[in-house]
Amino acid sequence: ITAGLHEDELIILAARPGVGKTAFVLNIAQNIGKMTNENVAIFSLEMGAEQLVNRMLCAEGSIDANHLRTGQLEESEWQNLIIAMGSLSKANIYIDDTPGVKMAEIRAKCRRLAKEKDGIGLIVVDYLQLIEGSGQENRQQVVSAISRQLKKLAKELRVPVIALSQLSRGVEQRQDKRPVLSDIRESGSIEQDADIVAFLYRDDYYRDEPGEDGEDGGSQP
C-alpha cells in the first residue's frame, strides 16, 4: 500500500491498546534487521528490552509465549528457540528501553549510532505519547513538538521513522469504532508532520475481551 519504507518519512502507526501495533512494528524491524543488514534502532518506552526480545524470539520461532515465559517449552520449541536466537543474533537491532527518555536523548543516540555503525535503516519509537517533554507545555503541545522533531530527525539522518501512537478512549463511545485522525491521543499537529498515518483495527477486538498481557495480549507476540 505504501510501496515500502522511504528515507525521510515519519510514519505514525496508531491503535487502541491490545490491537497489536507493537507486534506489527517488531515484525517490520526484524525483517529489516535480518534481510537488509541495515541497523534498526528501537526506543521502547513501554516495555523492557527483555520483553521485546522474548516477543521477537516467539515470533521468529513460532513459540508459544506462555511456554517461554514459564520455561516449559516442548522439545520442538527448544529447537526452534535455538534457531531463532541464532537468526536474531545476526540482525542489527538495537533496543533502548530507557524510561522517561526525552527527544533530545533519542536524537543524540540515533546520531551516535548512525555515526558508529555507518547509518541506520529504521528508527522505531514505542510509543509517541510516552516521550518526556522539555518544558511546562500541556501534553498536546509536547506531543506536537515531539512529532515535529521526529520528522526533523528522519530528514537529518535520511531514515524512515515509525512512531507508535495511542488512540483516545473516545473511539470506544462511537458505534463505528474504526479510528480516524481526530482519535489520535493529544494529536496536535501529528497529521501535518507525518507523511503517513496508519491505523490498526480489528473487529474481533470489540467482540472479545482484550488480552491481559499488556499492549498486545494473547499467547503469541
Residue ranges and their predicted role:
Residues 41, 45, 112, 120-163:
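Helical hairpin unit composed of two closely spaced alpha helices linked by a short loop
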Residues 18:
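Walker A (P-loop) phosphate-binding loop of P-loop NTPases
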Residues 14-15:
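The Walker A (P-loop) glycine that initiates the GxxxxGKT/S ATP-binding motif of P-loop NTPases
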Residues 1-8:
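Phosphate-binding P-loop
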Residues 25-27, 31-119, 133:
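Cytosolic-facing regulatory segments adjacent to core modules
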Residues 141-221:
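Phosphate-binding/switch region of NTP-binding enzymes
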Residues 11, 94, 123-125:
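Hydrophobic positions in the central parallel beta-sheet of the AAA+
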Residues 21-22:
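Conserved lysine of the Walker
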